[in-house]
Amino acid sequence: MSFEIPRKQYAQLYGPTTGDSIRLADTELFLEIEKDYTVYGEEVVFGGGKVIRDGMGQNGQLTRAEDIPDTVITNVIVLDYTGIYKADIALKDGHIFKIGKAGNPQITDGVDIVIGASTEIIAGERKILTAGGIDTHIHFISPEQVPAALCNGITTMVGGGTGPAEGTKATTITPGAWHISRMLQAAEGLPVNIGLFGKGHASAVEPLAEQIRAGAVGLKVHEDWGSTTSSIDMSLRVADEYDVQIAIHTDTLNECGFVEDTIRAIDGRVIHTFHTEGAGGGHAPDIIKIAGLPNVLPASTNPTLPYTRNTIEEHLDMLMVCHHLNPDIPEDVAFADSRIRAETIAAEDVLHDLGIFAITSSDSQAMGRVGEVVTRTWQVADAMKRQRGALHDPSGAPHGSAESDNFRLKRYIAKYTINAAIAQGMADVIGSVEEGKFADLVLWDPAFFGVKPELVIKGGQIAYALMGDANASIPTPQPRTMRPMFATYGKALQQTSITFLSQAAIDAGVPAELGLQRIIKPVSGIRNLTKADLKYNGETPDIAVDPETYKVTVDGVEVTSQPSDVLPMAQRYFLF
């Protein structure tokens, strides 16, 4: 005998289901659930008098070795490039084990995930689950960036640096084997996944190759060290040999050539361009046109995301500090001014919305804010909906109902998850909510989505959480703030975080030589990438910049946006 209950009551008990919509934070973005893998009337819920008890929703006979998961997140809404759906998510051995319907098959049909005595439960009802974010533009200036990033849902940090040295404050580079070794050892105490860039500036192969063999996952070419065509070509030769990525910050002053010369030096080889709009650095005024090439994986940094009435004004001072410039030297001021163009910044948000710019990142403490990658990505999505209206898949493929924002949500979630992972050769391990992936996951209350997570899970264990006073009688009394949890302590940290290395470094025995105890994974599959491999962000139109007005056109049509006066996900969330 079936029993019907009102949809609102069902959502209160078990969370919303297929066809229901959820507002994300205080934005104008609405998520619609496309599929529900749970079974109506057979939902598993934990608590007093609830379903997950021995002999009911929990099987009391099977051991952990008999496919019993370590953790099940129940009835959670997944927002991922793979889809927007509701399911039970099982974690085992630090990985996503199964996605489907949890319960006890002895009493329930259609069970994919068997809950047992070895299983912990995280209640996902009325919550949203995303993959842990990946920030591919990290200046490792301060280790305090790590908790700031985790508190916004970032679980992987890729970049370079040695601390607050001038080279690091300006460039994402860990130069040479000695510094790479020390930073890999320092990463042993950081509860995030780590990958390091070496210095991509040499006129011979071996000074670059030795950094890859020392453990770098790629090389960074940066104008402050000289973004010359020879450095670009030599770095790409080494990258092709070792299957690593080259990240590039091109020549703002056009001293070594123009954007066309850089494109010729790249010569069709895959490359990851940083702050491709140009305010963060790059050929003035038209580096942005490189985003239309099929071998370029273009990223933005968050100082210019989203475009607001304050964006232009705040950039000059940031630039002077980050690039060791002197405000008393007219040439230094002119250099800074040349990078800040309202017209190209106004086009940047639109290029993200069109799927031309593919990745968002921070540029941490070097103009960007490491704890705002997720927030600012969704602020751009909201601004674009307000200014450009609904966004639908040009292929005509369905993504929920016509009223939902599902296609736009998949495009934007991909920018700091799967696409960042693909660009760095990490996508077989992290970057999405898929079976077999490392269990780096973020749980959000929809009202706080993109701003403050409820839980951050690293390698299957809770690393950070919204937690109340530790001396209180329950976990929820104010002040509730993001605090470190057990995955960040002791040896658990090393078993829940990954250090990415080149395959050459692993083959050379670097982990044993340095005494590394963390999980070690190689980057791979990079040199055969094209922009078409990026999810929901693979467009390659013709982009042009008027050399006099700086107006940007895409396939001959001008693209621009208006600066926002007010943003969602902002002051009302940060009163305390």
Swiss-Prot record:
Binding-site residues, Ni(2+) 1: H137, H139, K220, D363
GO biological process: urea catabolic process
Post-translational modification: Carboxylation allows a single lysine to coordinate two nickel ions.
Residues the entry annotates as binding Ni(2+) 2: K220, H249, H275
Cofactor binding note: Binds 2 nickel ions per subunit.
Protein keywords: Cytoplasm, Hydrolase, Metal-binding, Nickel
InterPro entries: Amidohydro-rel (IPR006680), Metal-dep_hydrolase_composite (IPR011059), Metal_Hydrolase (IPR032466), Urease_alpha_N_dom (IPR011612), Urease_alpha_subunit (IPR050112), Urease_AS (IPR017950), Urease_asu (IPR005848), Urease_asu_c (IPR017951)
EC number, as in UniProt: 3.5.1.5
GO CC terms: cytoplasm
Domain Urease: residue ranges: 132-576
Catalytic function, reaction form: urea + 2 H2O + H(+) = hydrogencarbonate + 2 NH4(+)
Official protein name in the record: Urease subunit alpha
Organism taxonomic ancestry: Bacteria, Bacillati, Actinomycetota, Actinomycetes, Micrococcales
Originating gene: ureC
